[in-house]
Amino acid sequence: MQTIYLKKFGKVLVSRPAGREAFNAIRSTLNASELIQIDFEDVLTVTPSWFDEFLTNLADFSTGTVTLLPTQNASVLAALPVLATARQDKVASIIQQFLSKK
């Protein structure tokens, strides 16, 4: 099991290019077949565009399970339904699984 602590990319996560850059920065440290968890602790804000880019790249890379750890972060809770509605793929499935546990 691997945990990605998003706080290592900053407290304010904005823009599609920054999301892509964040994923590219950690790709070489990840094992694609292992469970990957995403931790939102200490992140103040994440925009749908940043998270869409990051999670899309992660979902495409991973052959295992990707899960989102529970959070009370309002920006995360607002961004996720937007992404889940806009997509019909592995990213939407990851988000729907998280939202069903709320």
Describe the residue ranges of each PLM region.
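Residues at alpha-helix caps and immediate loop-helix transition turns in enzyme cores, especially N-
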Residues: 18, 50-51
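STAS-like cytosolic regulatory interaction modules
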Residues: 1-44, 56-102
